[in-house]
Amino acid sequence: MYYNRLVEKQIELKLKTSGAVVVAGPKFCGKTTTCMLYQKSFVKLNTKQAITMARMNPKGVLQGENPRLIDEWQKAPDVWNQVKDDLDFNYEFGKYILTGSSTPADKTEVHHSGAGRIAPVRMRPMSLWESKDSKGTVSLKSLFDEVEDFPWDMNEKFDLENVAHLICRGGWPVSVVAPKEIALEITKNYWNGLFVFEDCENERFRNKKPEVLKMIVRSFARHISTEAAISTIIADVRQSNERTMDPKTFDDYMEALKDLYIIEDMEAWNPNIRSKTPIRSTPTRHFVDTSIACRSLGISPDDLMQDLESFGLFFEDMAVRDLRIYADTLGGEVRHYRDNAGLECDAVVHLEDGRWGAVEIKIGGDKLIEDGATSLKTLRNKIVEKSEEKAPAFMMVLTAVGGTYRRDDGVYVVPINLLKP
């Protein structure tokens, strides 16, 4: 069963406006299945024989009807150079589709950036809208367009137990379509195989110790949705595992995790405020999918229900995943704001045309919603008074549960299972 993906529109647009498209994202997020919709011929570099042949004759990999899909191109990095050279001599729109679940083993083998010829598209696991776990009552686009008739929905049949399951299940397509009683086991299998590199042709990953990668992931998971410094995470690795970890080794392993598209930190938003209070630039620690963090710590839905403080941090991570996917469809990006005066905003959705929306992420409940709304209004006032930015197009408290409505002060309250792009 195939569920349509929001990234499809981006792929279609890039194929109409670029010679090639490269779709990058973590393993098992659905890249190949989605890209197969657009190919007229394909080659999969998923066997030793195919990889060896592609490395010996990378130009031959390009032979076939266009659009030509080259799956896991990074296993034969010179394919990239051949695609770029072919487009230099015989440019056509939508000629090639490349997919990759990691960066190349040796980045020096890629001699050109591909700018102007190869358009990048980022693909993540499924959002709740894509997995059909969101009714889509509220559109992010409509909030930017300042909708007049805001929908009202009590959302009565959705509770924290539902949210806990979605956090632990993740947005992996195979888990999404599976019956609820086995979905978590499928996600567990994904985690168990994530760092199995014995037969990996990529020496940079094969030389990494899986147990060390898992230790670092666990430390990141313990600091999920926080601005923990790298030094703090290194100290956590040392203390939790009673082993040494020098910064150089940590950086090497961290690069591998980012090259596998597992860690996806959120950068700070800097609106150039005229103030003596500096804006903090430390990124917020996030995962491409929260289920990875859950599995790394052995956290179940029941565990989340027993610790609502941790629940809130893991929920924030899942909410950021969905906001990123939705923002991508609007040509925007998601960042966070925090200054040394303590004012913060969990997510700032910023569009290319300069419009922006401020989002506070809360589990729910009157007090937390009120706290979120107060913080949003304080941020709005500060931005308007002390920067050249316009007022936010919208302010939203994104909740785990509860109904959706617009408050008298203009702040929207929207549960995550009612949001769509």
Model-predicted regions and their roles:
Residues 31:
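Conserved lysine of the Walker
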Residues 108-226:
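Interdomain motor-coupling "hinge/lid" segment immediately C-terminal to the ATP-binding subdomain
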Residues 81-104, 112:
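Conserved catalytic/switch belt of AAA+ P-loop NTPases
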Residues 176, 180-355:
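Accessory nucleic acid-recognition modules appended to NTPase machines
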Residues 1-12:
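N-terminal pre-Walker A segment at the start of P-loop NTPase domains
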Residues 319, 323, 345-349, 355-365, ...:
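Conserved catalytic cores of phosphodiester-cleaving nucleases, focusing on short active-site segments
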Residues 398-421:
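Domain-level recognition of nuclease-like catalytic cores that cleave nucleotide substrates
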Residues 34:
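Hydrophobic positions on the alpha1 helix immediately C-terminal to the Walker A/P-loop
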